[in-house]
Structure formats: C-alpha cells, structure tokens
UniProtKB/Swiss-Prot annotation:
GO terms for cellular component: nucleus. InterPro entries: C2H2-ZF_domain-containing (IPR050636), Znf_C2H2_sf (IPR036236), Znf_C2H2_type (IPR013087). Belongs to the krueppel C2H2-type zinc-finger protein family. A zinc finger (C2H2-type) spans 6-28, 34-56, 62-84, 90-112, 117-139. GO terms for molecular function: DNA binding; zinc ion binding. This is Gastrula zinc finger protein XlCGF29.1. It is found in: Nucleus. It comes from the Eukaryota.
Length: 139
C-alpha cells in the first residue's frame, strides 16, 4: 500500500497524494471552483463539470417537459419520463439526476460528498469505517 502522508485536518482522512487531499478539502469548504461556461453552475470537481456540460450539447434534441433534462435519443427520454410518473421525485442538488425515492438519492449523494460513515455523536462523516472508529474514540 502507498504511504498516506497527507491528512485532512478536518476529518483525519489520509491521502497518498497532495492533489487528492486538496480535492477532498473542497468537501469541507463547500467551494465549487469549476463553473459551467453555459449556465454558470459551479462544481466541486472538473469531472462533474464535464458531465454537466454534456447536457448543453446541441445534439440532445429530446427534452423532458417536467425537469428540462435533455437526451440524445428518444428512448432515453422515454425511460427518464417513468421517473416522473410517481407523485414525488427527488432531484440531486449537485447534478441533474432525478431519483424516485429518497433512499436512492441518499445513496447517490455519497458520490458527491465521498462521505459514507456518519458519527452518531457529532456532524462529522467519513469515507472509511476505520477513520470513523478512530474518530469515535475522542467522544
């Protein structure tokens, strides 16, 4: 295993590369340095911006009349429309994905926050269970 010598001072998660620590720190600051040139929406990671920019491409002529999401092919739009058939839907605030249940949205949100193990004593959450256990020893 690689030496993880770069540690976050907020949550004690460790990284083998300084660049990964810097990217991780955006979770705590809420900073979104990657802005869409089409609509101005900000993103924490360049990867999320690239995914978002594909929604602005002109070769996506099929538009959902409920939420505005666009599709390259009609069958993609038709599949998506099923998510609106239930009375309630749960959109992700970070990207434009929509979920038919809050549980599905909560699982998806982990991809944005990279936090999966919450401390029951405070508001901190951790990506790795071992870091949560280490943290819980301070309570």
């Amino acid at each position: 295993t690689k030496d993880k010598s770069f540690t976050c001072t907020e949550c004690e998660e460790s990284f083998s590369l300084k660049s990964r620590l810097i990217a991780h720190l955006l979770i705590h600051t809420g900073e979104k340095p990657f802005d869409s040139t089409k609509c101005g929406k900000g993103f924490r990671r360049n990867q999320y911006l690239k995914e978002h920019l594909s929604t602005h491409r002109e070769d996506r002529p099929f538009v959902c009349t409920v939420c505005g999401k666009t599709y390259k092919y009609k069958h993609g739009l038709n599949t998506h429309l099923h998510s609106h058939k239930v009375n309630t839907y749960f959109p992700c605030s970070e990207c434009r994905k929509i979920f038919s249940s809050k549980a599905s949205l909560d699982i998806h949100l982990r991809h944005h926050t990279e936090k999966t193990f919450p401390c029951t004593e405070c508001d901190k959450t951790f990506k790795q269970k071992k870091n949560l256990k280490r943290h819980q020893m301070i309570h």
